[in-house]
Amino acid sequence: MATVKELKATARPAGGKGAARAERRAGRVPGVIYGDNKPPVTISVDDTELRARILAGRFLTTIFDVELDGQKHRVIPRDFHLDPVRDFPIHVDFLRLGEGALIRVSVPLHLKNAEGAPGVKRGGTVNIVTHTVELEAEAESIPQFIEADVSQLDIGSSLHLSDVVLPKGVKTLSREDLTLVTIVPPSGYAEELKAAAAGPAAGAAAPAAAPAAGAKAPAAGAKAPAAGAKAPAAPAAKKK
């Protein structure tokens, strides 16, 4: 179940870029809460607190209770913008969560038992093909990450989305045959396989060649009688 975090906000009047710049100069980040068939509410949050939340990771999959004028709004971040030069937040959007509402989120993939995989023990490398998975779930059921157990993967093997057990109440929006992880062979692995395959073939060829070579011996010996047959034809002794 998702952990709900607290975040304090202050209502701000709707305004243009000038009002937003004034908020930033005061150390606050302008934002908005919208959704659930209710009017949007313009807010501002403390710059330091928001930056810490973003840097902590998984910001866009974290549920917040935003406290505003004594009331709490259950929300999930939908977007945020950073200053292109100084890399600090300059705007944030929150989606208001109604009861039982289904939320689409992108959740990171975490690996389990990677070092115990047979392919890794044989020198292979884990290659993460898909880093995030698109899911749909109720707000309280959104997982912080999806765990993929790769303990059975050998060199050349792959793990697909269909091999992963999703938490209860969570549905994937991606293809079931989506490749998540593969084990890449080490350098020179293909040459080793060729050499291993060539070894038995060469061993089988050697015994077959031996009889062929031996078969020539009788043929060579067969010529000996022919040479000996000429011996009686030597000149006879002259008569006196």
Curated annotation (Swiss-Prot):
One of its GO terms (cellular component) is cytosolic large ribosomal subunit. One of its GO terms (biological process) is translation. Part of the 50S ribosomal subunit; part of the 5S rRNA/L5/L18/L25 subcomplex. Contacts the 5S rRNA. Binds to the 5S rRNA independently of L5 and L18. This is Large ribosomal subunit protein bL25. InterPro entries: Rbsml_bL25/Gln-tRNA_synth_N, Ribosomal_bL25/Gln-tRNA_synth, Ribosomal_bL25_b-dom, Ribosomal_bL25_C, Ribosomal_bL25_long, Ribosomal_L25_dom, Ribosomal_uL5_bac-type. NCBIfam families: bL25_bact_ctc, PRK05618.1-2. Residues 1-23, 207-240 are annotated as: Disordered. HAMAP family: Ribosomal_bL25_CTC. Pfam families: Ribosomal_L25p, Ribosomal_TL5_C. One of its GO terms (molecular function) is 5S rRNA binding. Belongs to the bacterial ribosomal protein bL25 family. CTC subfamily. Keywords: Ribonucleoprotein, Ribosomal protein, RNA-binding, rRNA-binding. This is one of the proteins that binds to the 5S RNA in the ribosome where it forms part of the central protuberance. It comes from Rhodopseudomonas palustris (strain BisB18).
